Amino acid sequence: MSKIIVGDDGTIDPKSSERRPRRAAYALPTFFTAGNIFLGYVSVIQSFQGAMLAASGGVGAEPHFELAAKYIGLAVFLDGLDGRIARMTHTTSDFGRELDSLADVISFGIAPAVLAFAWGIQFLDPSIDAAIREQVVRFGYFFSFLFLLCGSARLARFNIQKNPIPKNPGRPDRKYFVGLAIPAGAGMVASVVYASGSSPIHYWPFAVAWLALLALLSFLMVSTWRYYSFKDINLQRPRSFLIAIGLGSLIYLIWNYSQPVLLGLASAYVASGIIIRIGGIVRRRLRPAPPARDAEHQVG
């Protein structure tokens, strides 16, 4: 029988044979995180390749932007898997958390920021007024960088918070994110590009609207508004077959109507935090004031 080496802190020494079968389990979530990084990298490459076609009038740029958006969407999917796999296999680690954060900066910060500028600003009609074009391009640099900066700040805030759940999370059996998660912001950018047929923006009013969306997403990521995290979904609970049916239906809709369905899902999720915030403000204003306790102020 092999000897189990136990350290002073009660953990099993890595040299012990008891730890060797666990190494493969630790590598599994890291494999998904590495895939996340790869998808972010190739998304940036595709955005660059599409942007280089601006000089030729944009002919042939659409396939590159479509792939860039799809790679971001696949990265969102992998990002949702690596954490769940680590928790299911009890292989969470500080290294895994840090690597996952760096992967998120690449796939959901840099990749969508580059795509947002290349698709939304790079192909403006050259016939528009030069002064307008110059200003739109300048704001394009600023707001695409702002998206990256706010997404990175969102990740940093999440990492340092011991309990990144709002003090008033609503129903106690549900978990919420504080602010829009950076994968959701990246998914919104990718879904708009994908739903448009990946045809880049040519008219400056549409480019201004695009920059306004980037500004909104940047604000939501660093806000303290509540967003449902979906982390409490458990298919092993009673009546979980209803969740399975819903997920199956959703997969069918995405498979057959991917462009409108993905855009609708991303838009609904982004809007959900705004609706929750507005609803909370309205409820507080409509809440009746507590009755004044006049008896305490009366002089006997």
Regions found by a protein language model. Name each.
Residues 1-80, 276, 300:
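Topogenic membrane-insertion module of multi-pass membrane proteins
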Residues 28-35, 68-71, 102, 106, ...:
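Alpha-helical transmembrane segments
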Residues 41-44, 74, 78, 112, ...:
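Alpha-helical transmembrane segments of polytopic integral membrane proteins
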Residues 38, 77, 81, 85, ...:
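Active-site His/Glu-centered metal-binding helix of metallohydrolases
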Residues 84-96, 152-168, 222-230, 278:
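C-terminal ends of transmembrane helices
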Residues 42-70, 114-142, 192-209, 256-260:
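Helix-coil boundary and interhelical linker segments in multi-pass alpha-helical membrane proteins
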Residues 1-18, 166-300:
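C-terminal membrane-associated helical module and adjoining short loops/tails
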Residues 31, 63, 70, 88-156:
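Multi-pass membrane catalytic core of lipid/isoprenoid biosynthesis enzymes
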